[in-house]
């Protein structure tokens, strides 16, 4: 059975957790292929809200095996805190597994993340301060510590010493901080070994064997397309590749085994942190979307920047990820707005751009060119088919589908799992 990948099509917080949760009851494995506890997502099940950070949303699907993939960076302390929090609420976390090849976030990564952001001042990226970027830097620099290293104290010590040799110089001489003691870091990691050991697997082997046996594997991408270190609005991006190609690398599932690439996209647009955002609203409408949509970060509580739907971004995201389907979320948030603008192109220094500008400078100068659609006042949270939607809401959805260039197979009309219009089956269609 081929694999399915879910990818955020904007700047994150699109509702990937809801999409994963909706499909979770029909899949056998849910793997998180990238990111760490910097990418929070909210899942509502039976009126209960769960805010997940490091764990895949599939942890709440009783039939699925949730896996933290090799492309992730894992803060072990945060991992077990999140597990304990779910268990305290009666959730079953016993099926959770972690790739032996996933990298670890060390306490010094978090220190470096925070002091670097402060040092940069106005040039700061706006990270969550959780050490994700520094952990990925170590991975690429071949100084990283992996999950499997926790079970070999000799290897662990060698790697910690190698990593701290340079970092202590930076902390002491540049940031005026105290040096980090090797023994403290080694003991920190070893303290998790006993509890971690039964969770660790060869995830590449497990997932590909599952596919060989006809099982359904869902890859749940973190962050989003325009936070991708290669395809995003660089340098205001994350440190990994949260696109469909990155899901393949971060799970060990080859690209030819992926049958569906599903983009998750809001009916409007949000962004957290610094970086360009052509359709951003700076008036009371932006505040309205923020409050009505509950647009506050799961991890940081920071208010999200809000703006109108951007079809240029949607087309580019579809191209980069090879989307077969879009899952649109939060259509209900737009209820009550008299006229809804949609960005269909950009004006860059007097020149119309129907597609994403090539350069960073051009994108910073991009101004949205809008088309306007009549809104609706009717409550749509009970709609379960397109025909149930008011005419104006239906027209809005169909217009977005045409402008975005990829079929809309599901539409979220509320936060709960069942508040979804399914147009096309996302697994078998």
From Swiss-Prot:
InterPro entries: Adenylosuccin_syn_GTP-bd, Adenylosuccin_syn_Lys_AS, Adenylosuccinate_synth_dom1, Adenylosuccinate_synth_dom2, Adenylosuccinate_synth_dom3, Adenylosuccinate_synthetase, P-loop_NTPase. It comes from Pseudarthrobacter chlorophenolicus (strain ATCC 700700 / DSM 12829 / CIP 107037 / JCM 12360 / KCTC 9906 / NCIMB 13794 / A6). SMART domains: Adenylsucc_synt. Its cofactor is Mg(2+). NCBIfam families: PRK01117.1 (NF002223), purA (TIGR00184). It catalyses: IMP + L-aspartate + GTP = N(6)-(1,2-dicarboxyethyl)-AMP + GDP + phosphate + 2 H(+). This is Adenylosuccinate synthetase. SUPFAM superfamilies: P-loop containing nucleoside triphosphate hydrolases (SSF52540). Plays an important role in the de novo pathway of purine nucleotide biosynthesis. Catalyzes the first committed step in the biosynthesis of AMP from IMP. One of its GO terms (molecular function) is adenylosuccinate synthase activity. The keyword Repressor does not apply. The keyword Ligase applies. Binds 1 Mg(2+) ion per subunit. Homodimer. Keywords: Cytoplasm, GTP-binding, Ligase, Magnesium, Metal-binding, Nucleotide-binding, Purine biosynthesis. The gene is purA.
């Amino acid at each position: 059975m081929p694999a399915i990948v879910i990818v955020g099509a904007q700047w994150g917080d699109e509702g990937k957790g809801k999409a994963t949760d909706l499909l979770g009851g029909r899949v056998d494995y849910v793997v998180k292929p990238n990111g760490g506890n910097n990418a929070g997502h909210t899942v509502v099940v039976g009126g209960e809200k769960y805010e997940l950070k490091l764990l895949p949303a599939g942890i709440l699907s009783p039939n699925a095996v949730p896996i933290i993939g090799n492309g992730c960076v894992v803060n072990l302390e945060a991992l077990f805190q999140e597990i304990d929090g779910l268990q305290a609420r009666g959730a079953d976390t016993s099926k959770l597994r972690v790739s032996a090849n996933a990298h670890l976030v060390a306490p010094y990564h978090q220190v470096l993340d925070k002091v670097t952001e402060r040092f940069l001042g106005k040039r700061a990226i706006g990270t969550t301060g959780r050490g994700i970027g520094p952990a990925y830097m170590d991975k690429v620099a071949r100084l990283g510590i992996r999950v499997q290293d926790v079970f070999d104290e000799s290897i662990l010590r060698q790697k910690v010493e190698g990593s701290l040799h340079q970092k202590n110089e930076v902390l002491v001489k540049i940031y005026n901080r105290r040096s980090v003691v090797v023994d403290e870091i080694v003991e920190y990691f070893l303290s998790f070994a006993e509890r971690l050991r039964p969770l660790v697997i060869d995830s590449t082997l497990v997932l590909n064997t599952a596919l060989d046996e006809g099982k359904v594997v869902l890859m749940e991408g973190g962050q989003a397309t325009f936070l991708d270190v290669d395809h995003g609005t660089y340098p205001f991006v994350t440190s990994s590749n949260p696109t469909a190609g990155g899901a393949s690398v971060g799970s060990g599932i080859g690209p030819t085994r992926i049958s569906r690439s599903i983009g998750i996209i809001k009916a409007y647009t949000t962004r957290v942190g610094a970086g360009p955002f052509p359709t951003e609203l700076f008036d009371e409408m932006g505040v309205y979307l923020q409050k009505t949509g509950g647009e506050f970060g799961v991890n940081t509580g920071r208010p999200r920047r809000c703006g109108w739907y951007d079809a240029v971004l949607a087309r580019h995201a579809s191209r980069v990820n090879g989307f077969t389907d879009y899952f649109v979320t939060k259509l209900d948030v737009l209820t009550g707005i008299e006229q809804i603008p949609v960005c269909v192109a950009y004006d860059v220094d007097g020149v119309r751009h129907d597609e994403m500008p090539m350069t960073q400078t051009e994108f910073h100068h991009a101004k949205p060119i809008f088309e306007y659609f009549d809104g609706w006042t009717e409550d749509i949270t009970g709609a379960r088919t397109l025909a149930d939607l008011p005419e104006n809401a239906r027209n809005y959805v169909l217009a977005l589908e045409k402008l975005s260039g990829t079929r809309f197979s599901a539409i979220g009309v509320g936060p709960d799992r069942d508040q979804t219009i399914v147009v096309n089956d996302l697994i078998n269609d």
